From Swiss-Prot:
Nucleus is among the record's keywords: no
Gene3D superfamilies per the UniProt record, alphabetical: 3.30.1320.10
The name this protein goes by in its record: Small ribosomal subunit protein bS16
GO molecular function, one term: structural constituent of ribosome
Gene expressing this chain: rpsP
Coiled coil: none
Organism of provenance: Polaromonas sp. (strain JS666 / ATCC BAA-500)
PANTHER family: 30S RIBOSOMAL PROTEIN S16 (PTHR12919), SMALL RIBOSOMAL SUBUNIT PROTEIN BS16M (PTHR12919:SF20)
Gene Ontology biological-process entries: translation
Length: 83
């Protein structure tokens, strides 16, 4: 099964997450199919905290990829911010 989930990056105490499409059996930070965005939970000032390629998200959801609960929350948050 293909899932859309967060892959952690950054350094200790400075998390940064890539929003990736990956096979469910692959480890969290392992091989992925496509990177469709990022989430920076500690963005300050003018820094961008969330970016998701909506066209790619729509494509992957259309072919059956399952978003994680956190990614679902971030998508809703991004849609509310864009509206």
């Amino acid at each position: 099964m293909v899932v859309i989930r967060l892959a952690r990056g950054g350094s200790k105490h400075r998390p940064f997450f890539n929003i990736v499409v990956a096979d469910k059996r692959v480890r969290r930070d392992g091989r992925f199919i496509e990177r469709i965005g990022f989430y920076n939970p500690i963005a300050k000032g003018g820094e961008e905290g969330l970016r998701i390629a909506q066209d790619r998200l729509t494509h992957w959801l259309g072919v059956g990829a399952q978003p994680s609960p956190t990614v679902e929350r971030l998508v809703k948050q991004g849609a509310a911010k864009a509206a």
